[in-house]
Amino acid sequence: MKFGSPPGDAAGGVAAMWTRLLVERASWTLIDQGVVSLGGFILNVQLARYLTGSDYGTFALFMGAVFIFRAVDFSLISYPLSVQLCATPRREHAALLGSTAAIAIALAGVLSVLMFAGTVLLGRGDIAYATTACFLSWQAQETTRRFLSADFRHRAAVWGDATSFLGQAAIIGVLASAASLTLQSALYAISAMFLAGAAVHVSKLQFARPDFAAIVPMFRKFFELGKWSLLTYEVVLLRTQLFPWALAVFAGTAATASWQAALNIANLMNPIILGIGTVIPQAAAQARLSGGITGAWRAARGYILFGLPPILVFCAFVLLAPHFALRLAYSADSPYLDMSLCVQILALAWAAEYVGEMIAKTLLGAELGGLAFLTNATGVVGAVVALPLIIPFGVLGACLALAIAILIRLIFAWLILSWLLAKETSPTAIRAEAQVPR
């Protein structure tokens, strides 16, 4: 497989136009995701500094639960919407968004009940209302954000995301300086900023009255489109969330806090991983219509190459100066400064995660969700097999096990993609395509 070049036989002015479009879309999605990740990183650093290890570990577990529920919303709402918008006339977008919003509200209600019940069952009834409020407000912010990004409006999403995520970092800083920061107050403060960001997003969207008669058929269609995405993202989350929960069981929530502290450094690559990953499904879906899986991959790899240099530069920095990165993030007297080796392992793992995740996103965009699920399932198998490393090595074992799982997923994803491209470009496939009536 070769990287580079625009889709099809584009040349000259068409190639230049395609390149400008790619750069514009990729740039704004990276800027938007950069704002989100910067705010999230500052928030996590502040909470790691000022909360007890036990409370910060609890916060990390809560975040994991939110991501699991967010995957349901993304797969059954945001991903199908991004596919549908490509084929819907612009004059009908408001009607589509109105009906989609109604489905999203109903789904959020169900998930919020599960969030409340889960918090109580885990023995933290004291923060059940706070976690549920935070989850619902996050749902509102993230769903409206996805409404914008589904139409490639990443530039329009920046202000709402800045309000939410940079606002959270600011308000947590104020609470910490006033000695009023607790896990509960942090969750309520985060909720308030998510609602403010959602309001900004809504101001940039147009909604028509929902067509309630069409909502059930629409949800069925969304479910058909999103079921493989749901399975895919849940196994991805299972692969990553398996380790903090296992650490909490075998070593306590303080070990989970150390894991999260190391992961926060690697997560600085998330603006690229999540940003490029946001735009690839839509780009691959559009290119597949005329170019098949080959066209989808050609479209996707341009975005992958766009994000690869900063991934490699950051990975090299962390490998060369892990202690400096930890000290810069958590201060010179932080209990997390002994996590250097863990940070190095996770940095390498996240670089591999970038490529593997983008291949999986390409498969989803090309409506090959079954193969995307199979690809990610291999990572879960690798995680389960490597999980016992936690017992002798603790947090270090968790980092090694996750790196092994990510590497297995990457290898399998590359093999799947190579097989698909070879199959589509084989002489037999080309002859069959030539015989199809036009």
Language-model region placement:
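Signature of the first transmembrane helix
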Residues: 3, 18-75, 227-254, 315, ...
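Hydrophobic transmembrane helix module of multi-pass membrane transport proteins
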Residues: 102-231, 348, 355-361, 373-378, ...
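Interfacial segments at transmembrane-helix termini and the short loops linking adjacent helices
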Residues: 118-131, 320-351, 396
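Membrane-water interface segments that mark the loop-to-transmembrane alpha-helix transition
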Residues: 24-37, 62, 66-119, 126, ...
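Helix-loop junctions and terminal segments of transmembrane helices
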Residues: 40, 73-90, 262, 266-292, ...
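Small-residue-rich transmembrane alpha-helices that serve as helix-helix interface/gating elements
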Residues: 184-198, 377, 381-382, 396-414
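Transmembrane helical elements of multi-pass membrane transporters/channels
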Residues: 24-41, 157, 163-164, 168, ...
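Interhelical loop/hinge segments that connect adjacent transmembrane helices in multipass membrane
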Residues: 5-22, 129, 155-160, 181-189, ...
